[in-house]
Design a protein with these regions (language model features):
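Short catalytic-loop micro-motif centered on adjacent basic/acidic residues
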Residues: 93-96, 119-123, 200-201
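Zn-dependent metallo-beta-lactamase
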Residues: 4-90
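Metallo-beta-lactamase
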Residues: 41, 92, 99, 153-205, 209-210, 219, ...
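Active-site metal-binding motif and surrounding structural segment of the metallo-beta-lactamase
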Residues: 102-148
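Conserved beta-strand hairpin/beta-sheet module of binuclear metal-dependent hydrolase folds
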Residues: 56-113, 117, 214-226
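Accessory terminal helices/loops
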Residues: 258-263, 270-329
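Extracytoplasmic/secreted proteins, especially bacterial periplasmic and envelope-associated proteins
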Residues: 106, 132, 136, 248-251, ...
């Protein structure tokens, strides 16, 4: 099996540059398992259409300015973030963006190197680390639409509020976030047309926050999961501090699994990991392990330590520490 190609932004506090260029035109049509091959249309709607392709751009961890550190840790990096481009013969749809101006310029350069016409940018959910950089991308692609479901837009407005920026985002990333944030327009309906193929926005409800979605491309078996699934990165369960919320997240994972995807791209993933559908089951197991250990431990430290024993190699221990404290304090 041919290993799939992943494009990684290089740099740590310096200008970010795509590691491989050009990112898209050189790539053969690939299956959702990562093999390079033509994708066969699955419905009459797509017969005769150019098969869609997709690529993932991952920006590495960047340092966060905070004193809120996990036990034994000297720093708290923000985990890698992924952005996915889905494209046909001419046009492309970009799913999610990044936090900082530098990250987002690298993303825009990567998309521009493809020569594709970026028609649409879609946000899977309202967390700022997946849309603050859209304004920077739009400087390069001013004709692209930035869209999301109305309930996602409501969360975006909260994240981009002066209070949220002043108390959370800007102190953690001083001078790095655009001062001209844009909010998505509310999308009417749940389907984006890409050269005759459906890109379906699937409402998932609560996952790591309220009103989340994933994007499903039936013709190529792809799900872009946003933060509904993680890949080698500790899940952010801070907002899931009640059992009912964690069960809602599991139900969302079940819903994605019912679509029978052949590839699933997580919003936060360890660089180099495959975009395998097994990350749905892995994310579900993580939540269930957290749930089980939450009932058998008494302190945040104990819960944190027990989860680390199960997931020693996963990134972003700071998120695990915050999750443990959210239900033990």
């Amino acid at each position: 099996m041919t290993s799939r190609r992943e494009f990684v932004a290089k740099g740590f506090g310096t200008a970010l540059v795509a590691a491989v260029t050009p990112p898209i035109r050189a790539q053969e049509p690939r299956s959702a398992h990562g093999q390079s091959r033509a994708g066969a249309p699955k419905s009459g709607r797509t017969t005769g259409k150019t098969a869609l392709r997709w690529e993932v751009f991952v920006t590495p961890s960047i340092p966060v300015i905070t004193s809120d550190l996990a036990p034994g840790e000297k720093e708290r990096p923000w985990p890698p973030i992924s952005s996915t481009v889905i494209y046909g013969e001419r046009d492309a749809v970009l799913v999610d963006a990044f936090i900082t101006v530098e990250q987002s310029r690298a993303l825009a350069n990567w998309v521009a190197a493809s020569g594709k016409n970026l028609t649409t940018i879609c946000a899977t959910h309202g967390h700022g680390d997946h849309f603050f950089g859209v304004s920077t991308v739009l400087e390069r692609f001013p004709d692209a639409r930035f869209v999301a479901r109305p309930d996602v837009v409501a969360i975006m407005r909260q994240q981009a509020s002066p209070e949220s920026l002043a108390t959370f985002w800007n102190p953690r990333f001083p001078g790095q976030i655009s001062s001209h944030l844009v909010i998505a327009e509310e999308l009417t309906g749940d389907v984006i047309d890409l050269e005759g193929h459906d890109v379906v926005i699937v409402p998932l409800g609560f996952t790591d926050t309220d009103n989340t979605t994933c994007l499903h491309v039936p013709s190529i078996g792809l799900i872009v999961a946003g933060d509904a699934a993680y890949n080698g990165v500790h899940l952010r369960l801070v907002e899931s501090n009640q059992q009912g919320k964690r069960q809602e997240w599991i139900a969302a994972l079940d819903k994605m699994e019912s679509l029978k995807p052949r590839a699933v791209v997580a919003g936060h993933k360890r660089i180099g990991n495959e975009d395998s559908p097994r990350i749905i089951a892995e994310s579900r197991k993580y939540i269930r392990d957290f749930e089980r250990l939450a009932m058998t431990t008494t302190t945040a430290q104990e819960l944190y330590d027990q989860m680390l024993k199960l997931y020693p190699g996963w990134l972003n221990r700071g998120a695990l520490w915050s999750s443990a404290r959210a239900i033990k304090t």
